[in-house]
From Swiss-Prot:
This is N-acetylglucosaminyltransferase. Its EC number is 2.4.1.-. GO terms for cellular component: plasma membrane. It comes from Rhizobium leguminosarum bv. phaseoli. It comes from the Bacteria. Keywords: Cell membrane, Glycosyltransferase, Membrane, Nodulation, Plasmid, Transferase. It is found in: Cell membrane. GO terms for molecular function: hyaluronan synthase activity.
Length: 428
């Protein structure tokens, strides 16, 4: 065995050990739990809670935005519903005008037009300041909700310490060859990771596509807006860090389905994956020092950061061995193939869907595209080039009652706030 072959085999063996421990704990904690909402001792609502839906939008495709808003308007929910669409300085606003006007006729819809792009956080906060509902549902403008999402996400009791997220799926119908892979990726992220994390009341990544919080927890958006990593502000660091700071739990509801649009070209797809990779590293690194993090969540933090690096190292040394010696690292390659087949078989059995056997083909995308991308993401965690240069604003608006459309103006620089502590989860 050459040094490169040994190094590659050791790296992939460590990855296999870490992955086995992680997946085993996932299997254990995916079992039904006896913990119920009633155990927290708070009574029920006297009536259905009111829900405010916040939809930030920037340069969205008019058809996609229309489908998103139509899915919200068609929700099967008997309580009061108010929708706040905030256009974050879109450059295609003229193309979106017909969509804005069509939904502005619905008294439940409020359309806010920001004169300049201020970033997703600030756009959300503009609506949060106006929100008065019991619950706040954040929905991305490229997401289409099932008709019963709000009904399933709204808690059936008045417990304040709960946030909930639904299950994401790929586009329906599948338009691109890669769409089935995207759909399976969403299923794995929701049902392998978030469902187990929810057992401890601390979902580590709450996608903005479909997440609901109590209004009292939405007051933590000031801390969310001021989260720092390496003394810099980042727009995509997850809200759960500030949400959990106030001892609020976050749960996962797999029956609440939301379909989201996925990139249909390689460039946008890699850009999305790069943003997600940076977000994963930043958020898990912020969560790593927590003293009360239980064993599973600590392993989750370690696995999210260390696992891809070990696999990266194994692949790079294997390629170097092939280039320098002309021999292939067969042992490392066989271990990767065996782990892939085993994982996909277990998932197919658990999901009762044979399509997950075909997810083995995604390994090539993962190894040759996503792993180098994750390594690059780790080396560029401080990169903020994609964020808007306008970070803060002051609420100043004029309203037109007929169209229920608000033009927002006046900008200012917000004072810097200290970074908040991170999430603490209790062991079960």
């Amino acid at each position: 065995m050459t040094m490169l072959d040994t190094t590659s085999t050791v790296a992939v063996s460590l990855y296999a050990l870490l992955s086995t421990a992680y997946k085993s704990m996932q299997a254990v904690y995916s079992l039904p739990t006896d913990v119920s909402l009633a155990s927290h001792g708070l009574g029920g609502f006297d009536e259905l809670p009111s829900v405010d839906v916040i939809v930030p939008s920037f340069n969205e495709d008019p058809r996609t935005l229309s489908e998103c808003l139509a899915s919200i308007a068609g929700q099967e929910y008997g309580g009061r519903l108010q929708v706040y669409l905030v256009d974050d300085g879109s450059e295609n606003r003229e193309a979106l005008r017909l969509v804005h006007e069509a939904f502005a006729r619905d008294p439940r819809f409020n359309i806010l037009l920001l004169p300049q792009n201020v970033g997703k956080r600030k756009a959300q906060d503009r609506c949060d300041q106006r929100s008065a509902g019991d619950m706040v549902l954040n929905v991305d403008s490229d997401t289409i909700l099932a008709s019963d999402v709000i009904r399933k996400l709204v808690p059936k009791n008045a417990r304040v310490a709960v946030g909930r997220m639904g299950q994401l799926t790929g586009p329906q119908p599948k338009r691109q060859l890669a769409d089935p892979f995207d759909d399976m990726e969403y299923w794995l992220a929701c049902n392998e990771e978030r469902s187990q994390q929810a057992r401890f009341g601390c979902v580590m990544f709450c996608s903005g596509s479909c997440v609901m919080y109590r209004l009292v927890s939405a007051s933590l958006l000031d801390q969310y807006d001021a989260q720092y990593f390496r003394k810099q502000r980042f727009g995509e660091i997850d809200i759960h860090l500030s949400h959990a700071e106030g001892s609020f739990r976050t749960e996962y509801r797999p029956s609440a389905h939301a379909a989201t649009v996925v990139p249909n070209k390689l460039g946008p797809y890699l850009g999305q994956q790069l943003r997600w990779a940076r977000s994963t590293f930043r958020t898990t690194l912020l969560g790593a020092p927590l003293p009360n993090l239980n064993r599973f969540l600590m392993l989750d933090v370690v696995g999210q950061n260390l696992g891809p690096l070990l696999l990266d190292h194994s692949v790079l040394t294997g390629l170097a061995q092939l280039a320098l010696t002309g021999t292939a690292p067969w042992l490392a390659a066989l271990m990767i193939v065996a782990m892939t087949i085993d994982r996909c078989s277990v998932v197919a059995l658990r999901a009762r869907q044979l399509r997950f056997l075909g997810f083995s083909l995604h390994t090539f995308i993962n190894i040759f595209l996503l792993l180098p991308l994750k390594a690059y993401a780790l080396c560029t965690l401080s990169n903020i080039a994609w964020l808007s240069s306008l970070l803060c604003w002051q609420l100043e608006s004029t309203s037109t009652a007929d169209a229920r459309t608000t033009e927002c103006s006046d900008m200012r620089t917000a004072s810097k706030l200290s970074p908040p502590p991170s999430c603490q989860a209790n062991d079960v």
